[in-house]
């Protein structure tokens, strides 16, 4: 009996049916992998290839870490993804952007999920040290009372998985509620607000597009203005936008969460000051001057006043200026004040200029 050639009409019919069946099962498989956290959060994957994950839209969580979004140009922060090394590769840490040596608050060892470990004087939090089986979170050790609060969180590990988030919330947020569930914890209810690494902003379970993605080496700034009740986010010391309003008289804390295995974040700045006339004037000056200008450099201020403002309100006057992004594309800056070290807790060189953030 002669064998029918594969380019015949019958074979084309069979192959088309197989393709339709595969297309119908593909969304269900992706949904199942996301629900259980396979591969994307450090678990074993039942797929033979990561090819499909590479085609996911930017807003969809992925097993592929986000790259190219670092505050600095250190090679370790912008290395292309390598599937044979992720997520277990060890990357040297840089110190870029870590100028402060006074911190108004750090992470609270008594208000954290079980899958978290603190280091660097409680400024660095590591999630899921071996493998991930859910969502872990931690809260700052100080309530954000009246005044102006600004802090920065640096992503010190590959950023990937179901979600890694930065935000705020009340003391009613249950940090261990989803320890066996992969989810976007911050903003899941009315008690918290969270910005995801995918660029989505979440509150009351509602998600909206807010920013571009962020990855390892990115610095996420958060400004809570309790006087006006406004929450603003920054990325790599550039303003993203207002995330929430009507937050006056709320008892809020800084929060972060992660579902990714062997992930970590670090507080590199935490400041607070009263809503004084001095602050309001500095904030207005920052609005009037071009975004790329360092207010302290261009204004004809006496040296003493310039130093006082730099110490107390430098984060207001310099945010968004070229000086705040001096490590971008500047290899000499990276070498002198942000050189590699085996530990991200190693202090910078003595000759590096440090900006103190003191209470007013």
UniProtKB/Swiss-Prot annotation:
Q: Which family does it belong to?
A: Belongs to the SPSB family.
Enumerate the subcellular locations listed in this protein's record, separating them with semicolons. Answer: Nucleus
Q: Name one GO biological process term.
A: proteasome-mediated ubiquitin-dependent protein catabolic process
The UniProt entry, under PROSITE patterns, shows: B302_SPRY, SOCS
Q: Which residues form the signal peptide?
A: none
Query: Where are stretches of biased composition, namely Polar residues?
Result: 332-346
Disulfide bond residue pairs: none
Drop me one GO molecular function for this one.
Answer: ubiquitin-like ligase-substrate adaptor activity
Pathway assigned in UniProt? Protein modification; protein ubiquitination
List every stretch annotated Disordered.
21-54, 322-350
- Looking at the record, the residues that make up the B30.2/SPRY domain are 84-274
Please describe the quaternary structure of this protein. Answer: Substrate-recognition component of the ECS(SPSB3) complex, composed of spsb3, cul5, elob, elob and rnf7/rbx2.
SMART domains (UniProt xref): SPRY
What does the UniProt function comment say about this protein?
Answer: Substrate-recognition component of a cullin-5-RING E3 ubiquitin-protein ligase complex (ECS complex, also named CRL5 complex), which mediates the ubiquitination and subsequent proteasomal degradation of target proteins.
Q: Name the CDD domains on file.
A: SPRY_SOCS3
The protein depicted here goes by the name SPRY domain-containing SOCS box protein 3
**Domain-level remarks:** The SOCS box domain mediates the interaction with the Elongin BC complex, an adapter module in different E3 ubiquitin ligase complexes.
Q: Which Gene3D superfamilies match?
A: 2.60.120.920
């Amino acid at each position: 009996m002669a064998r029918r050639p594969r380019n015949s009409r019958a074979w084309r019919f069979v192959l088309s049916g197989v393709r339709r069946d595969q297309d119908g099962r593909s969304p269900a498989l992706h949904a199942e992998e996301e629900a259980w956290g396979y591969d994307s959060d450090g678990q074993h994957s039942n797929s033979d290839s990561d090819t499909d994950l590479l085609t996911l839209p930017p807003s969809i969580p992925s097993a592929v870490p986000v790259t190219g979004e670092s505050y600095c140009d250190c090679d370790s922060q912008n290395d292309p993804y390598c599937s044979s090394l992720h997520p277990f590769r060890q990357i040297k840490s840089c110190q870029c952007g870590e100028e402060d040596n006074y911190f108004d608050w750090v992470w609270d060892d008594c208000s954290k999920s079980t899958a978290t470990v603190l280091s660097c004087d409680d400024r660095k939090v590591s999630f899921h040290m071996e493998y991930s089986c859910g969502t872990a979170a931690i809260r700052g050790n100080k309530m954000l009372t009246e005044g102006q609060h600004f802090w920065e969180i640096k992503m010190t590990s590959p950023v990937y998985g179901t979600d890694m988030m930065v935000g705020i919330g009340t003391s009613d947020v249950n940090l261990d509620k989803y320890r066996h569930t992969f989810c976007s914890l911050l903003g899941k209810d009315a008690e918290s607000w969270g910005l995801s690494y995918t660029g989505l902003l979440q509150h009351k379970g509602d998600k909206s597009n807010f920013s571009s993605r962020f990855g390892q080496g990115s610095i996420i700034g958060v400004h809570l203005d309790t006087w006006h009740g406004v929450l603003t986010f920054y990325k790599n010391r550039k303003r993203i936008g207002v995330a929430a309003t009507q937050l006056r008289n709320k008892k809020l804390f800084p929060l972060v969460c992660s579902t990714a295995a062997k992930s970590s974040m670090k507080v590199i700045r935490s400041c607070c000051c009263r809503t004084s006339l001095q602050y309001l004037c500095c904030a207005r000056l920052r609005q009037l001057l071009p975004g790329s200008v360092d207010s302290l450099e261009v204004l004809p201020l006496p040296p003493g006043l310039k130093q006082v403002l730099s110490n107390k309100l430098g984060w207001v006057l310099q945010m968004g200026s070229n000086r705040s992004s001096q490590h971008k594309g500047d290899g000499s800056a990276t070498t002198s004040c942000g050189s590699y070290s085996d530990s991200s807790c190693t202090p910078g060189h003595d000759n590096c200029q440090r900006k103190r953030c003191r209470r007013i």
